[in-house]
Amino acid sequence: MQKAIIIGATSGIGQEVARILVQQGWHIGIAGRREEALHALQATAPDRIITEQLDVTEETATLHLHNLIKKLGGIDLFFLSSGVGHQNRDLQPDIELNTARTNVEGFTRMVTAAFNYFKEKGSGHIAVISSIAGTKGLGVAPAYSATKRFQNTYIEALAQLARMQHLDIHFTDCLLYTSPS
C-alpha cells in the first residue's frame, strides 16, 4: 500500500492531487489551514484519508507533519502544494513579507522535515509545486517570483545533497506552465 502526505490539500492543485491519489488506491494524509475543507475531502474516502490541521508558517508545523506520518504508519511521497502569491504593484511590505514567510520559511520548514524523514527511512519522494515565475520573474509579483526561484534552487540543492550522501530520495519540482497546443 502506497502512502502520501499532501500539504496544502484544502484547495487547488493539492486538493486535486489528493483526489487522484485516492482514486489510484493510495492512503493519504492531508494537511492545511482550513479544517472544514480537510474534513470535506476526508468524507469522500474516510477509510483512506486522515487529516491534520497545520499552518506551514508556524513552528509547530513539523510536529503536526510527524504526527500525520505516525498516523499513516509512514509515507512514500511528500507533496507540498502550500503557497501564496499576490500581485503587488505598490510593493506593500506586508504582502511581500507574508509571501516570503509562506513560500520560503514555510517551504523550508516542511521540505527539510520531509528530507530528514526520508533520510532516516532510507528512501522517499519529495514533490513540490513551484512556478515558471521562478525562472523569469513577474514584475507585478516580485516576492512571489523571488520565492519561487528560491524553491527551484532549494530543491536542486537537496537533490544534489541526496546524491552526495548516496540517499534514495527523489525530487519532483512541478513548474506550472501551459504546454503548446
Map each language-model feature to its residues.
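Short alpha-helical oligomerization interface
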Residues: 89-101
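Rossmann-fold cofactor-recognition segment
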Residues: 45-60
